[in-house]
């Protein structure tokens, strides 16, 4: 875009505060504080900068919960970031964002992912180009219509002040992005996804990103509070591990954030904290017709209008 005026310091302050707010809320819900791992890359390394990882493993509610903040810079955008905008290939960059994935212990609690980020591409003698990206999406093992509707309504409410066209646009983008092409199935019930967003200018784009970040806790926590105490057994845990396998497949094969981190020389522990602690694969497994497991495929991981 032509307007190159932006304020990285304000974005950084917001993102660090968002990470802290979410980590505190999850720790209070679980009863276990999230550990803090602050990391830094040296000026001579391929990727410079640092960040903070907040992590919980083996909790009462969350089997694994990871929330990462990073602010890194490099000399050339990796291919995953410039594939859709080849004119940016080879530019230097700064990328800062918060990304989280939560894997609850109870199979009736859905996995969730959220990310908000800003990227700046630079080239000597030319104005910097910035954009925002992010979104959130819900991946149930056992679907509940109330949960999907609540999650989508909260996403819509976060976007509506910035234009009624944004929710349907970002919802469709999410359905198309979180799709396992080799399985011909969606990863979950979707949510919202956006990238390369800078159309309204810095201030309005930043406000929209903040609205998405601020909507995460009200979108997700009520679902966990409804489902975390539901009884479950070995059958449900087995299906949870099987569905987590799909999560692994998507993140390692398709996810642009994972590819960006690995291609740019990012911190592997932070990049792969999105992986579930336990996952499995079964050869040519099919759910029993009419079962709750079959309903996930027929009623939930298909494109639907949830609002």
Swiss-Prot record:
Site residues (Important for dimerization), renumbered to this chain: 182
Subcellular location: Cytoplasm
Listed InterPro entries: Coprogen_oxidase_aer, Coprogen_oxidase_aer_sf, Coprogen_oxidase_CS
Cofactor dependency: a divalent metal cation
UniProt keyword annotations, A-Z: Cytoplasm, Heme biosynthesis, Metal-binding, Oxidoreductase, Porphyrin biosynthesis
Catalytic activity: coproporphyrinogen III + O2 + 2 H(+) = protoporphyrinogen IX + 2 CO2 + 2 H2O
Active site: 113 (proton donor)
Pfam families: Coprogen_oxidas
Sequence positions that bind a divalent metal cation: 103, 113, 152, 182
Pathway involvement of the protein, from the record: Porphyrin-containing compound metabolism; protoporphyrin-IX biosynthesis; protoporphyrinogen-IX from coproporphyrinogen-III (O2 route): step 1/1
Enzyme class of the recorded protein, top EC level: oxidoreductase
PANTHER family from the UniProt entry: COPROPORPHYRINOGEN III OXIDASE, MITOCHONDRIAL (PTHR10755), OXYGEN-DEPENDENT COPROPORPHYRINOGEN-III OXIDASE, MITOCHONDRIAL (PTHR10755:SF0)
Protein name from the UniProt record: Oxygen-dependent coproporphyrinogen-III oxidase
Taxon lineage: Bacteria, Pseudomonadati, Pseudomonadota, Betaproteobacteria, Burkholderiales
Gene: hemF
